[in-house]
Amino acid sequence: MLPLVLYNYARVLDLCGRYEEGAALAKEGQDACIQYGHYRFLPNCLEIEAECRHFMGDEETSKELYYQSYYLCKIIKYNVGLEVIKQEAKEYLNIQFED
């Protein structure tokens, strides 16, 4: 439950333009996913942190996080998340993922 709460709160902060706080909570969400072995929201938390890092001007970290989220979505066959990541990565960083 904690990863879901952290993901949702990080998403709200991201949408409000509070990128540093959003990135920190998304990272906390990732840590909670790993700590408790609940990986369902791990790609989402990675995606939120990637978007926040982009808007904070940290393109290298953002790029790495988008790649991690993309491949995790592919592994778990989370197609909705995959499409979001492909769209954002292309729009923000000009990354073209191949299928």
Q: What name fits each language-model region?
A:
Residues 22, 26-29, 62, 66-69:
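Tetratricopeptide repeat
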Residues 1, 8, 41, 48, ...:
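"A position-specific structural signal for the A-helix of alpha-solenoid helical repeats
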Residues 32-40, 72-80:
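Short coil/turn linkers that connect adjacent helices within long alpha-helical scaffolds
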